[in-house]
């Protein structure tokens, strides 16, 4: 199931917010630059598979949860 960069970025931003992390904290935990996290959340960057694994681990979520498309009619807030 392929999601757009914008959908993936939104999923990561939601997971980060739910975890109570700043972009800087997530970047540090995932071994990425803060600018990369910001670009990712804006839908301007698609992470490599190893980066996605590190992000999911840092966020304590399954990689597939980040890659799932919302169901039709599902409101994302």
Where are these regions (language model features)?
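DNA major-groove recognition helix of helix-turn-helix/homeodomain DNA-binding modules
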Residues: 48-65
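Residue-level detection of the helix-turn-helix DNA-binding "recognition helix"
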Residues: 17, 31, 42-44, 71
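Helix-turn-helix DNA-binding elements, focusing on the entry/boundary residues of the two helices
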Residues: 12, 23, 34, 49-52
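Short alpha-helical DNA-recognition segment
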Residues: 20-39
């Amino acid at each position: 199931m392929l999601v757009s960069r914008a959908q993936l970025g939104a999923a990561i931003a939601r997971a980060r917010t739910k975890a109570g992390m700043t972009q800087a904290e997530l970047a540090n935990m995932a071994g990425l630059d803060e600018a990369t996290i910001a670009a990712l959340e804006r839908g301007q960057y698609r992470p490599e598979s190893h980066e996605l694994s590190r992000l999911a681990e840092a966020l304590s979520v399954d990689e597939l949860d980040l890659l799932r498309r919302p169901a039709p009619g599902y409101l994302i807030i």
